[in-house]
């Protein structure tokens, strides 16, 4: 989970979160994303960023950046701040953009044989709250797993003071063979059932969009977003359990 990774990174992890989250290097699929998304993720990855730097980084016109960022500001996703990275200057303070962190919230969960863990994060990747529930057994039926996930979500919302309508989406990881594109758990050491469309069942239970994947795949993404993988082209994550 992202929370475990950030704690393991210690002060360096805190520094990374405060200076943005997300990959710092361009990914192969970047050019296929909508330009509005590229602009937003460029700002989020850098923590804060002047419009001219966004235009230069994405190789687009300043006018296009102004149009896109104005829309993102109107939607409550970005906000203007004084550009603290450029130091003092005469006249009007330089302006940068940063993510409006409280505009959206997401939940990440890890399901395991001993306990299930959940974290609530804002749009800037800051952890707002954490919650845990003990797993009733080493391997569970799908029905029991859905019940425990629902209980975990209730506990997280209670600790954070948020309600379900504040949450935009949920990402869930668990060990085993997971078809992330279809949301199907083919086999998992924490579940009795096989070939279960767990993503759709969880989405129906929670009433929210759900993304489901193998927990090590998600740990690798956490390293890409928060850890040493942010600024390098290739890396590997090895887990020993």
Model-predicted regions and their roles:
Residues 50, 79-80, 179:
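Short beta-strand(s) of the beta-wing in winged-helix/HTH DNA-binding folds
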